[in-house]
Swiss-Prot record:
Subunit organization: Forms a cylinder of 14 subunits composed of two heptameric rings stacked back-to-back. Interacts with the co-chaperonin GroES.
Function statement: Together with its co-chaperonin GroES, plays an essential role in assisting protein folding. The GroEL-GroES system forms a nano-cage that allows encapsulation of the non-native substrate proteins and provides a physical environment optimized to promote and accelerate protein folding.
GO BP of this protein: protein refolding
Gene: groEL1
Organism of provenance: Synechococcus sp. (strain CC9902)
Name assigned to this protein: Chaperonin GroEL 1
Gene Ontology MF terms in the entry: ATP binding; ATP-dependent protein folding chaperone; isomerase activity; unfolded protein binding
Amino acid sequence: MAKRIIYNENARRALEKGIDILAESVAVTLGPKGRNVVLEKKFGSPQIINDGVTIAKEIELEDHIENTGVALIRQAASKTNDAAGDGTTTATVLAHAMVKAGLRNVAAGANAITLKKGIDKASDFLVGKIKDMAKPIADSNAIAQVGTISAGNDEEVGKMIADAMDKVGKEGVISLEEGKSMETELEVTEGMRFDKGYISPYFATDTERMEAVLDEPYILLTDKKIGLVQDLVPVLEQIARTGKPLLIIAEDIEKEALATLVVNRLRGVLNVAAVKAPGFGDRRKAMLEDMAVLTNGQLITEDAGLKLENAKLEMLGTARRITINKDTTTIVAEGNEAAVGARCEQIKKQMDETDSTYDKEKLQERLAKLAGGVAVVKVGAATETEMKDKKLRLEDAINATKAAVEEGIVPGGGTTLAHLAPALEEWANGNLSGEELIGANIVAAALTAPLMRIAENAGANGAVVAENVKSRSNNEGYNAANGDYVDMLAAGIVDPAKVTRSGLQNAASIAGMVLTTECIVADLPEKKDAAPAGGGMGGGDFDY
């Protein structure tokens, strides 16, 4: 296919145009008074959301070159979402501000490579500063504050997540389900999560989120490799008659058997998913036995004289719901408290008997997985559109609280970054020179962008608010919800340090890439042939 090649300033300007479009669409959602964005869907009702990364994923432009700019800045949002699970809008606004200022300097003749070096050095300096400013999470009240801010100032959500973390521990599993009522409820049930995702992406039932969700499935647990589909046929036939989904957890599933399962899944014959068993050797077998106890099933192993081809329906485990993504599998079970309790006691005895620290650690991990359970948040809403929006906000809030537990909290509302701007300028003036210094100053100028946008979305003058905040002490910032200047930590307006750090690093990385672009190679749009003229109608010509 023929290509279109664009050089120098024209290339950078085309990227900038795409970046402007995406940044503006996402930035309107920032802050407590941020607005919603409506996503039109080809099928089904439109979606009304407030989540930066979801909006970014939806934007595709007609112009290929501008679309490249969109894709670049979308990456800043996606990477932040992958690392911290929140802060995607902040990352987009920061990247946009850095790119705009950087392109002005490149157009004026600055060397893009040296500018990028300055941007990278400034980013490293700021990461260290954020680490120093972070305060560890002290109690569940602080967790509730993080959840509240991340869910768009919804205190009920913040409290519920703090509750859930109290019940299942800070490392515990919190899973989201669509509820049946108008109220959002919390329930703690038996269950576990392990770090293995689906073997093939074709098992995903929700292609938008790339997740496989199985309701009331059967679970086949085996410690052998499944090579031939013939081994599975008897059990698959029994399950097909029940009409229920099936999850297979095995050491591995080889190509032929996997292909057969995928084909059956795609044709709708059987709703099936397959996952590799976690762990290695004896530890793998022990974890499979834990799952068998949890799901009230049997581990099909030749050590116990059981073969796959002879497996019966009653040997399979059951669960209320299983959610699988590319990296993890979450099992939500219920009704086996006694068996799970007995199994936990057995693991505790093994811990007492072993002298190896490594074995103790691994047994402790198994115990935590089995005893911790799963907190299920059932999302309630009046309409499906509201449900989807609430679910995205809750997901952000859960990710933000986990990030806060990991790396601590910093003052929120764009305050931390705004206060770091003078410190960065001072450090850069003392340690950098020439165009590297200009690069660092580009970052310093961009640091107030999130705060300015939060203020503008609340109807205030962003530049005035930013200057006012910079002149105050470190913890003081602008509360956009009511227009006051307050101590952010005392007011409970906090962000996880990890979210602020990830957003900044990814924004600096993307800005550096855009500034050092000198040429774009893209597909030429195909010329569509004009439709042939129709024959004239009898009785004279018509104007159309």
